[in-house]
Amino acid sequence: MKSVLIVYNQANNERVEYMLDELGIRGFTQWENVQGRGHINGDPHRGTHTWPEMNSAVLTIVDDDKVENLLRMVHKLDKRNSEVGIRAFVWNIEQMR
């Protein structure tokens, strides 16, 4: 099993949920109003007058065989509009109870 953290501009909220539904990924935890800045060339997302945009984040636990398709869809969404931004991070899950 893998843990996938997807961090994205709030403009992509509906697209990310649609992506999870399309892949049959039912369970997730979502955080709104996530602040941050991309590691290469991303602008800050702070919810302030200067930097008004905000991010959201979704954490889901999936079977190994769903990870590649999920990452492929995230990449496709990022290529669609790289200015908006979306990234996915994957970790191994040792145990789940």
Describe every region a protein language model picked out.
Residues M1-R97:
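Positively charged, small/polar-rich N-terminal and surface patches that mediate targeting and assembly
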